[in-house]
């Protein structure tokens, strides 16, 4: 499973990219608005940090303007995935951009039927929102299972399931178990994946035991084993 971070905070992106665990970035108008930065400049900087797909969303809702914005965003860098809403206009733009060789992320997916439409429109990614479905009393992960099952039945569908609106580590692990291709999550959720009380407890014990030895690994010379190797 690929891990994307859902943020427009450049400092957070740099920090997580340094771990070597980050495969891409997703942004949306709300996240960008919080930064107060010019959108195109910000996306360009993110693309300099992350070599994987960087989703940049159009702001318009009509097909003509969305297409113009999508083409403009696609010129920023080869790894830009233009993000469009799952509407008739959005899917029309998706098909055109896909035919032109641009990656497209179709967002705001809330049903398996919508996911089928996104795949038929040539989307590189479809983004079903699990957390928002949970919020209205549905089980968002059930949608992931449906989409993965349908896509698996049709090898011609090359669209990747990009699980969005992730709220906790369980959303991540269950999405992986179901076979989703990508999980995009806020930085806080990525950091929660590292955490386990037994890891902390075990590390504290190892550190305490090592300190009792009074040793320093870096002060110890590597033994000369050249003679042994020849033997």
From Swiss-Prot:
InterPro entries referenced in this protein's UniProt entry, alphabetically: Aldolase_TIM, TAL/FSA, Transaldolase_3B, Transaldolase_3B/F6P_aldolase, Transaldolase_AS, TSA/FSA_arc/bac
Pathway: Carbohydrate degradation; pentose phosphate pathway; D-glyceraldehyde 3-phosphate and beta-D-fructose 6-phosphate from D-ribose 5-phosphate and D-xylulose 5-phosphate (non-oxidative stage): step 2/3
Keyword field contains Cell wall biogenesis/degradation: no
GO terms, molecular function: aldehyde-lyase activity; transaldolase activity
Main location: cytoplasm
PANTHER family: FRUCTOSE-6-PHOSPHATE ALDOLASE 1-RELATED (PTHR10683:SF40), TRANSALDOLASE (PTHR10683)
Protein name: Probable transaldolase
Organism: Rhodospirillum centenum (strain ATCC 51521 / SW)
Organism classification: Bacteria, Pseudomonadati, Pseudomonadota, Alphaproteobacteria, Rhodospirillales
Gene: tal
């Amino acid at each position: 499973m690929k891990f994307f971070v859902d943020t427009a905070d450049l400092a957070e992106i740099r920090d997580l990219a340094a771990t070597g665990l980050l495969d891409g970035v997703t942004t949306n108008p709300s996240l960008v608005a919080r930064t107060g930065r010019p959108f195109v400049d910000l996306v360009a900087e993110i693309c300099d940090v992350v070599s994987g797909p960087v989703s940049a969303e159009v702001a318009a809702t009509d097909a003509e303007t969305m297409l113009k914005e999508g083409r403009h965003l696609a010129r920023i860098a080869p790894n830009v995935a233009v993000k469009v809403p799952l509407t008739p206009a959005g899917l029309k733009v998706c098909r055109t951009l896909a035919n032109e060789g641009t990656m497209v992320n179709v967002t705001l997916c809330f049903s398996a039927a919508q996911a089928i439409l996104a795949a038929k429109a040539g989307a590189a990614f479809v983004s079903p929102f699990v957390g928002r479905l949970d919020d209205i009393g549905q089980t968002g992960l059930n949608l992931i299972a449906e989409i993965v099952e349908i896509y698996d039945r049709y090898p011609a569908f090359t669209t990747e399931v990009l699980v969005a609106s992730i709220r906790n580590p369980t959303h991540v692990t269950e999405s992986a178990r179901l076979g989703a291709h990508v999980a995009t999550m806020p930085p806080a959720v990525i950091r929660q994946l590292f955490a386990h009380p037994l890891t902390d407890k075990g590390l504290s014990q190892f550190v305490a035991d090592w300190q009792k030895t009074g040793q320093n690994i870096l002060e110890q010379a590597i033994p000369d084993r050249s003679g042994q190797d020849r033997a």
